[in-house]
Amino acid sequence: MTWNYRVMNRGGHLAVYPVYYDESGNIHGRSEIPFSPEADNLEELRTTLELMLDALTEEILEHESVPKQSS
């Protein structure tokens, strides 16, 4: 399973969420809450923020239309 960050609209508010895909590239699920970046060092934080910025180039998803990731 692969994943990336995607912007989601939830009640008129935009946030970045991790989104998970199945082997065919279809959306399989999302995290329950938006992602808040943390890192052990500046380079790690930079990499995470760059991945989050990539989400701004993708279509905005509606939060309600993407199922929560199951355990």
Where are these regions (language model features)?
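Short N-terminal "domain-start" leader segments
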Residues: 1-24
